[in-house]
Amino acid sequence: MLWKSVLPVALIVLGIHDCSFKFIEIDKNEEEFAMSMEHVLFHFNENQNDDFAYKFLRVRRSLRKKYTQKYLVDLEMGRTLCGKYDEDIDNCPLQEGPGEKKVRCTYIVETRVWVTEFTILNSTCVQT
């Protein structure tokens, strides 16, 4: 008899627990996401042993962990003709021919926009 009352409670708790850890699709134009992606690009360029800057080519997937400001992003970046410390990387042309390099990366970044704090929790990149 006790199991009849415990089972529904256990299912509710498991359901709430399961829902709280899922990533959900988000709009790529969401302000907090856009700011996080600027940090991801800065982080990537800072950590490259390359004098040239990379820029976003395409965000393949953008997700946010439910009830948090943790973002998971799958993106592609390309090597530009500009140096990584140049001002306007967005308008730099991509390298072509022998210098051409493209990477596909997955980042998990936690954002606290109200204090301008971004933390890279995990990142993986491969050349394509």
Curated annotation (Swiss-Prot):
May play a specialized role in spermatogenesis. Its main location: secreted. It comes from the Eukaryota. Glycans are attached at residue 122. This is Cystatin-12. The keyword Transmembrane does not apply. It comes from Rattus norvegicus (Rat). Residues 1-21 form the signal peptide.
